[in-house]
Amino acid sequence: ERLEALIAIEHDDHATAAAIRAADPPPWLRIIPAPPGGPRTKPRAMNHALDLARGEIVGIYDAEDRPDPGQIRRAAAIFAKAPPRLACLQARLAFHNTADGWLPRCFAIEYIQWFHLVLPAMRRMGFPIPLGGTSLFFRRRALERLGAWDAWNVTEDADLGLRLARAGYETGLVDSDTQEEAVSRPLAWIRQRSRWQKGYLHTWMTHMRRPVRLWRGLG
Protein backbone atom coordinates (compact mmCIF):
# COMPACT_ATOMS: atom_id res chain seq x y z
CA GLU A 1 0.00 0.00 0.00
CA ARG A 2 1.13 3.53 -0.76
CA LEU A 3 -1.39 5.22 1.52
CA GLU A 4 -0.33 7.98 3.89
CA ALA A 5 -2.73 9.82 6.21
CA LEU A 6 -1.88 13.07 7.97
CA ILE A 7 -4.18 14.42 10.68
CA ALA A 8 -3.73 18.19 10.84
CA ILE A 9 -4.47 19.74 14.24
CA GLU A 10 -3.55 22.92 16.09
CA HIS A 11 -0.31 22.80 18.06
CA ASP A 12 -2.11 23.13 21.41
CA ASP A 13 -4.88 20.59 20.72
CA HIS A 14 -3.45 18.06 23.15
CA ALA A 15 -6.78 16.30 23.77
CA THR A 16 -7.21 15.34 20.11
CA ALA A 17 -3.60 14.23 19.82
CA ALA A 18 -3.94 12.06 22.94
CA ALA A 19 -7.18 10.49 21.69
CA ILE A 20 -5.57 9.58 18.37
CA ARG A 21 -2.56 7.99 20.05
CA ALA A 22 -4.82 6.08 22.43
CA ALA A 23 -6.59 4.53 19.44
CA ASP A 24 -3.30 2.88 18.37
CA PRO A 25 -3.26 4.27 14.81
CA PRO A 26 -1.56 2.37 11.98
CA PRO A 27 2.02 3.31 11.04
CA TRP A 28 0.89 5.12 7.87
CA LEU A 29 -1.04 7.69 9.95
CA ARG A 30 0.74 10.71 11.41
CA ILE A 31 -0.37 13.63 13.56
CA ILE A 32 0.74 16.99 12.15
CA PRO A 33 0.38 19.91 14.59
CA ALA A 34 0.27 23.31 12.90
CA PRO A 35 3.03 25.63 14.11
CA PRO A 36 2.11 28.34 16.62
CA GLY A 37 0.81 31.54 15.10
CA GLY A 38 -2.10 32.70 13.06
CA PRO A 39 -4.48 32.50 11.53
CA ARG A 40 -5.81 29.38 13.25
CA THR A 41 -7.63 28.11 10.20
CA LYS A 42 -8.11 24.85 8.35
CA PRO A 43 -6.29 26.07 5.20
CA ARG A 44 -3.23 27.12 7.19
CA ALA A 45 -3.08 23.70 8.85
CA MET A 46 -3.47 22.01 5.45
CA ASN A 47 -0.65 24.08 3.95
CA HIS A 48 1.66 22.94 6.73
CA ALA A 49 0.61 19.30 6.32
CA LEU A 50 1.14 19.52 2.56
CA ASP A 51 4.78 20.44 3.13
CA LEU A 52 5.23 17.19 5.07
CA ALA A 53 3.18 14.92 2.81
CA ARG A 54 4.96 12.55 0.43
CA GLY A 55 2.28 11.55 -2.08
CA GLU A 56 1.67 12.83 -5.59
CA ILE A 57 -2.11 12.77 -5.04
CA VAL A 58 -3.41 14.77 -2.08
CA GLY A 59 -6.84 14.02 -0.61
CA ILE A 60 -8.76 16.15 1.89
CA TYR A 61 -11.27 14.87 4.45
CA ASP A 62 -12.91 16.46 7.47
CA ALA A 63 -12.68 14.70 10.82
CA GLU A 64 -16.26 13.38 10.81
CA ASP A 65 -16.23 12.12 7.21
CA ARG A 66 -17.18 8.55 6.31
CA PRO A 67 -16.07 8.06 2.69
CA ASP A 68 -17.00 5.06 0.59
CA PRO A 69 -14.33 2.38 1.10
CA GLY A 70 -13.17 2.47 -2.52
CA GLN A 71 -13.23 6.24 -2.95
CA ILE A 72 -9.48 6.85 -2.78
CA ARG A 73 -8.68 4.04 -5.23
CA ARG A 74 -11.35 5.32 -7.60
CA ALA A 75 -9.89 8.82 -7.56
CA ALA A 76 -6.36 7.49 -8.11
CA ALA A 77 -7.57 5.42 -11.08
CA ILE A 78 -9.19 8.48 -12.67
CA PHE A 79 -6.01 10.52 -12.30
CA ALA A 80 -3.93 7.69 -13.77
CA LYS A 81 -5.97 7.76 -16.99
CA ALA A 82 -6.60 11.51 -17.24
CA PRO A 83 -4.38 14.21 -18.77
CA PRO A 84 -2.42 16.49 -16.41
CA ARG A 85 -4.90 19.35 -16.87
CA LEU A 86 -7.37 17.38 -14.71
CA ALA A 87 -6.00 18.64 -11.42
CA CYS A 88 -8.86 18.10 -8.98
CA LEU A 89 -11.64 15.61 -8.27
CA GLN A 90 -14.69 16.21 -6.08
CA ALA A 91 -16.66 13.35 -4.54
CA ARG A 92 -20.31 13.72 -3.54
CA LEU A 93 -21.25 14.70 0.00
CA ALA A 94 -24.27 13.38 1.90
CA PHE A 95 -25.43 13.20 5.51
CA HIS A 96 -25.82 10.22 7.83
CA ASN A 97 -27.85 11.98 10.55
CA THR A 98 -31.02 12.94 8.70
CA ALA A 99 -33.04 11.35 11.54
CA ASP A 100 -31.81 14.10 13.90
CA GLY A 101 -34.49 16.55 12.84
CA TRP A 102 -35.83 18.93 10.25
CA LEU A 103 -32.60 20.87 9.70
CA PRO A 104 -30.43 17.87 8.74
CA ARG A 105 -33.16 16.72 6.34
CA CYS A 106 -33.14 20.15 4.68
CA PHE A 107 -29.35 19.87 4.41
CA ALA A 108 -29.72 16.48 2.76
CA ILE A 109 -32.17 17.81 0.15
CA GLU A 110 -29.86 20.75 -0.57
CA TYR A 111 -26.82 18.52 -1.05
CA ILE A 112 -28.68 16.02 -3.24
CA GLN A 113 -29.58 18.75 -5.71
CA TRP A 114 -26.12 20.33 -5.49
CA PHE A 115 -24.00 17.22 -6.00
CA HIS A 116 -26.35 15.25 -8.25
CA LEU A 117 -27.72 18.06 -10.44
CA VAL A 118 -25.94 21.42 -10.15
CA LEU A 119 -22.29 20.34 -10.14
CA PRO A 120 -22.67 17.82 -13.01
CA ALA A 121 -24.41 20.53 -15.06
CA MET A 122 -21.66 23.04 -14.32
CA ARG A 123 -19.06 20.45 -15.28
CA ARG A 124 -20.76 19.73 -18.61
CA MET A 125 -21.03 23.44 -19.43
CA GLY A 126 -17.38 24.07 -18.60
CA PHE A 127 -18.01 26.37 -15.63
CA PRO A 128 -15.54 26.59 -12.71
CA ILE A 129 -16.48 24.08 -10.01
CA PRO A 130 -16.94 25.56 -6.51
CA LEU A 131 -15.25 22.92 -4.41
CA GLY A 132 -16.91 21.42 -1.35
CA GLY A 133 -14.06 21.64 1.15
CA THR A 134 -13.81 17.89 1.75
CA SER A 135 -13.65 14.64 -0.20
CA LEU A 136 -11.34 16.43 -2.62
CA PHE A 137 -8.35 15.01 -4.46
CA PHE A 138 -5.60 17.05 -6.11
CA ARG A 139 -2.54 16.48 -8.22
CA ARG A 140 0.14 17.73 -5.88
CA ARG A 141 2.09 19.44 -8.66
CA ALA A 142 -0.90 21.60 -9.62
CA LEU A 143 -1.70 22.39 -5.99
CA GLU A 144 1.84 23.56 -5.30
CA ARG A 145 1.99 25.54 -8.53
CA LEU A 146 -0.99 27.60 -7.33
CA GLY A 147 0.45 28.13 -3.86
CA ALA A 148 -1.98 25.68 -2.23
CA TRP A 149 -4.67 27.21 0.02
CA ASP A 150 -5.29 30.79 1.10
CA ALA A 151 -4.77 30.58 4.85
CA TRP A 152 -6.94 33.65 5.49
CA ASN A 153 -10.00 32.56 3.51
CA VAL A 154 -12.57 30.58 5.50
CA THR A 155 -13.99 29.19 2.24
CA GLU A 156 -10.61 28.22 0.87
CA ASP A 157 -12.31 25.57 -1.26
CA ALA A 158 -14.32 28.08 -3.31
CA ASP A 159 -11.24 30.25 -3.81
CA LEU A 160 -9.10 27.32 -4.92
CA GLY A 161 -11.75 26.14 -7.37
CA LEU A 162 -11.62 29.52 -9.10
CA ARG A 163 -7.82 29.62 -9.08
CA LEU A 164 -7.67 26.17 -10.66
CA ALA A 165 -9.99 27.28 -13.46
CA ARG A 166 -8.07 30.52 -14.02
CA ALA A 167 -4.83 28.56 -14.34
CA GLY A 168 -6.34 26.34 -17.05
CA TYR A 169 -6.92 23.26 -14.91
CA GLU A 170 -10.07 21.14 -14.90
CA THR A 171 -12.05 19.73 -11.98
CA GLY A 172 -13.81 16.39 -12.33
CA LEU A 173 -16.39 14.54 -10.26
CA VAL A 174 -15.98 11.15 -8.58
CA ASP A 175 -18.95 8.76 -8.59
CA SER A 176 -18.62 8.11 -4.87
CA ASP A 177 -20.25 9.38 -1.67
CA THR A 178 -18.90 10.65 1.63
CA GLN A 179 -21.23 10.71 4.61
CA GLU A 180 -20.97 13.75 6.87
CA GLU A 181 -22.78 14.98 9.97
CA ALA A 182 -25.12 17.92 9.34
CA VAL A 183 -25.58 20.56 12.02
CA SER A 184 -28.89 20.04 13.78
CA ARG A 185 -29.22 23.23 15.85
CA PRO A 186 -30.35 26.58 14.40
CA LEU A 187 -27.57 28.62 16.05
CA ALA A 188 -24.91 26.26 14.72
CA TRP A 189 -26.49 26.53 11.27
CA ILE A 190 -26.43 30.35 11.46
CA ARG A 191 -22.76 30.35 12.49
CA GLN A 192 -21.86 27.93 9.70
CA ARG A 193 -23.72 29.83 6.98
CA SER A 194 -22.37 33.17 8.24
CA ARG A 195 -18.84 31.81 7.93
CA TRP A 196 -19.57 30.57 4.42
CA GLN A 197 -20.97 33.94 3.35
CA LYS A 198 -17.94 35.70 4.82
CA GLY A 199 -15.66 33.40 2.83
CA TYR A 200 -17.64 33.81 -0.39
CA LEU A 201 -17.42 37.59 -0.03
CA HIS A 202 -13.67 37.30 0.59
CA THR A 203 -13.33 35.15 -2.54
CA TRP A 204 -15.43 37.53 -4.63
CA MET A 205 -13.44 40.58 -3.52
CA THR A 206 -10.13 38.81 -4.17
CA HIS A 207 -10.95 37.68 -7.69
CA MET A 208 -12.88 40.80 -8.72
CA ARG A 209 -9.98 43.15 -8.08
CA ARG A 210 -9.23 42.80 -11.80
CA PRO A 211 -12.51 41.70 -13.40
CA VAL A 212 -11.23 41.82 -16.98
CA ARG A 213 -8.34 39.52 -16.09
CA LEU A 214 -10.77 37.22 -14.26
CA TRP A 215 -13.06 37.07 -17.30
CA ARG A 216 -10.16 36.27 -19.61
CA GLY A 217 -8.74 33.68 -17.23
CA LEU A 218 -12.04 31.84 -17.02
CA GLY A 219 -12.47 31.90 -20.80
State where each predicted segment sits.
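Acidic metal-phosphate-binding loop of nucleotide-sugar-dependent transferases
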Residues: 13, 61, 65-67, 93
